């Protein structure tokens, strides 16, 4: 993929992340590249992050590693549509997109399946 194509792809995902952040239950929406870097999106304006920058970078790296490890089972179990964790302070969902991951965190009171469907619709995945 050329630099221009990458740039256009990341711009497209920036727009999708911004659309996700308009939803009241969404705290964070970002695209993580295969190197574990946030390349589009981020935290909703006015929202206080639950992790500092260093911990977020660790989270991104761990997420990419986990998603790539899960792909080993795609042949037998089918591709992962999304993964979700309900934590005490946030619901965290990840959506594999080729070799990247859309990472979304939401308020704890969300219905995970309903929210995941909404995210997939808004993000076009």
Predicted regions and their residues:
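Non-catalytic interaction/Regulatory regions outside core domains
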Residues: 1-125
